[in-house]
């Protein structure tokens, strides 16, 4: 374990204080308090970037299995259910950590949690590459799941607590940007090592040096000033703030931090399920929103991208991995403008646009796949020697040839596509359609001249259908990346009062990982039963349902302070008023409580709440 200085010691607070920072958890982009005096120094920015490396590691681990599974399922002869377990074991660890990680973060500090998560990720990766077995694969993936869940919470909170108020949204968004960048790197890695012997080891091992470097760097960075205040070390907190803000007087910000900590003790965890301040409605909105994040299908596209692409015509591992790299590129390109424009366009608008485009692209993908005569069942068959394709047997079986044997590869390329069948036991009167026998000498391979009987799939996917499927998939990914990808976490950070925001975020995070686990654990089985087209149609229905939910229940918080949002949502008839507004476009006045505020405490642009007015959130520079 990496030692830390006394200011991060294990002697304070249980779970009450957690990530309810002054202005919200991950994704908060504004606040009701006056802006802090200092701007973000270069030191603050570099500290945020160092912490956000956790997002890069999280994204890499989430996207990595898409390509690694193509090799591992052959080497271990994995069944459909075993493949699902390999993918979902990471989510099991993440779900368990989401239930208990907050206590660790509160007791030992955000910075120490990031260091521990980096070390645990390296340890889990070592387990994966030391020896390939199904049991060790599950154990290593569970350890990595615990790591990424812990780092997701800790990184988000740490950056939010060291960032100046009016730059918090920008700095916290670095974590989301790092996540999608990590996914892109994972897909590039999948492609780079797709045809390399033991390429899966390189895929799993690439993150180890980066994780170690982050752990070392985080050791030399300061703890969160808010955490120091929680421990009663106000003098140390003041020193950290002066270093982060490059100003000599941090009294005002320290006062705001202490005030927000007092607010946390006004609520208990069980208040989330009571009518106090309409909290029950708020938590139901939050839980339903993260439910739609998962049930619209994005996790399966992330984990099974290469598998899905193989089923629609990208038949080689290399082609499927290259096509899935486009998914990573689209995620990065789409996330950047969404992050930069959310303060001007609004999270609700992005959610509506994203859900609408997702439903259209999923419908297109489903219709296209109805016309592709391709059996998805081969994804779920056992990848034993009797069921391996010739290419899988020659190039990926344990102990077989390396990538350097160019003469063998050149000889293999001369075999026609219709010769690349699956090994099947023959005899007993079996006469499968498309049966063929071919004889092939494999020079310089150490293999004797052998006859192979194979069963070929005579269905060839038309190029137009194959590329239309890929285009629909990329549009779907882009729509998710501007809508249900980043925006729910911004909404969640704004709809709960500061005193209970951290615990609400923890509960919704557990819901997110839990539903993700259930969806990913059954994707291959369900697709095998009903077909990829009908899976797309189900996701289309869920996308339309999410659109209706966003329109009716999600407030437009653009241009509004956190206090204004909280006052509006605290009304017992909030849902009724929101639905009535959508039906009759009636205008709602600013709550009278807000009219009593001092002029300097109000945002003049926010005359109406939840989208009633079309004002914009003030620029950070104003």
Curated annotation (Swiss-Prot):
It holds the Pfam family Sugar_tr. It is found in: Cell membrane; Endomembrane system; Cytoplasm, Perinuclear region. Residues 66-84, 133-141, 190-201, 304-321, 371-471, 525-533 are extracellular. It is a multi-pass membrane protein. Belongs to the major facilitator superfamily. Sugar transporter (TC 2.A.1.1) family. Glucose transporter subfamily. NCBIfam families: SP (TIGR00879). This is Solute carrier family 2, facilitated glucose transporter member 12. The lineage of its organism: Eukaryota, Metazoa, Chordata, Craniata, Vertebrata.
């Amino acid at each position: 374990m990496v030692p830390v200085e006394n200011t991060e010691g294990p002697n304070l607070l249980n779970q009450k204080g957690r990530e309810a920072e002054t202005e919200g958890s991950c994704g908060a982009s504004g606040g009701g308090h006056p802006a802090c005096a200092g701007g973000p120094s270069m030191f603050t920015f570099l500290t945020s970037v160092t912490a956000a490396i956790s997002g890069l590691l999280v994204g890499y681990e989430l996207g990595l299995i898409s390509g690694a599974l193509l090799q591992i399922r052959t080497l271990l002869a994995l069944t459909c259910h075993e493949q699902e377990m390999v993918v979902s074991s990471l989510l099991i660890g993440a779900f368990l950590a989401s239930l208990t990680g907050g206590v660790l973060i509160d007791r030992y500090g955000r910075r120490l949690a990031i260091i521990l998560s980096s070390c645990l990720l390296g340890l889990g990766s070592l387990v994966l590459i030391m020896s390939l077995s199904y049991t060790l694969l599950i154990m290593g993936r569970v350890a990595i799941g615990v790591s990424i869940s812990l780092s997701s919470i800790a990184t988000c909170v740490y950056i939010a607590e060291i960032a100046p108020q009016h730059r918090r949204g920008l700095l916290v968004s670095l974590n989301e940007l790092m996540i999608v960048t990590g996914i892109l790197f994972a897909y590039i890695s999948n492609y780079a090592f797709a045809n390399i012997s033991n390429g899966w080891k390189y895929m799993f091992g690439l993150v180890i040096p980066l994780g170690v470097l982050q752990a070392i760097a985080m050791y030399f960075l300061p703890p969160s000033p808010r955490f120091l205040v929680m421990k009663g070390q106000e003098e140390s907190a003041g020193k950290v703030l002066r270093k982060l803000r490059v100003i000599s007087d941090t009294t005002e910000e320290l006062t705001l931090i202490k005030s927000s900590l007092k607010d946390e003790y006004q609520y208990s965890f069980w208040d989330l399920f009571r009518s106090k301040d309409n909290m029950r409605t708020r938590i139901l909105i939050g839980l339903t929103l993260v439910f739609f994040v998962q049930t619209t299908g994005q996790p399966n596209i992330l984990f099974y991208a290469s598998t899905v692409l193989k089923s629609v015509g990208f038949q080689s591992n290399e082609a499927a991995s290259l096509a899935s790299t486009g998914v990573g590129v689209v995620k990065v390109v789409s996330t950047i403008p969404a992050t930069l424009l959310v303060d001007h366009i609004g999270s609700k608008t992005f959610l509506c646009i994203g859900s609408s485009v997702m439903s259209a692209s999923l419908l297109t993908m489903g219709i296209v796949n109805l016309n592709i005569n391709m059996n998805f069942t081969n994804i779920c068959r056992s990848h034993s020697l009797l069921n391996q394709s010739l290419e899988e047997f020659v190039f990926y079986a344990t102990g077989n040839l390396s990538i350097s044997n160019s003469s063998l590869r050149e000889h293999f390329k001369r075999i026609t596509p219709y010769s690349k069948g699956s090994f099947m036991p023959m005899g007993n009167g079996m006469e499968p359609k498309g049966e063929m026998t071919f004889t092939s000498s494999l020079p310089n391979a150490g293999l004797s001249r052998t006859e192979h009987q194979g069963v070929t799939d005579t269905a060839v996917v038309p190029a137009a259908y194959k590329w239309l499927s890929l285009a629909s998939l990329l549009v779907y990914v882009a729509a998710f990346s501007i809508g249900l990808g980043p925006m729910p976490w911004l909404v969640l950070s704004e709809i709960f009062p500061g005193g209970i925001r951290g615990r609400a975020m923890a509960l919704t995070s557990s819901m997110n990982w839990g539903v993700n686990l259930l969806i990913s654990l059954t994707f291959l089985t369900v697709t095998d039963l009903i077909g990829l087209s009908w899976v797309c149609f189900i996701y289309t229905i869920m996308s339309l349902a999410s659109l209706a939910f966003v329109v009716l229940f999600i407030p437009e918080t653009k241009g509004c302070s956190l206090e204004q949002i909280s006052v509006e949502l605290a009304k017992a008839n909030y849902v009724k008023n929101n639905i009535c507004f959508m039906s009759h476009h009636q205008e709602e006045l600013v709550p009278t409580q807000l009219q009593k505020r001092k002029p300097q405490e109000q945002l003049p642009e926010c005359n109406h709440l939840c989208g009633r007015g079309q004002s914009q959130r003030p620029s950070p520079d104003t």
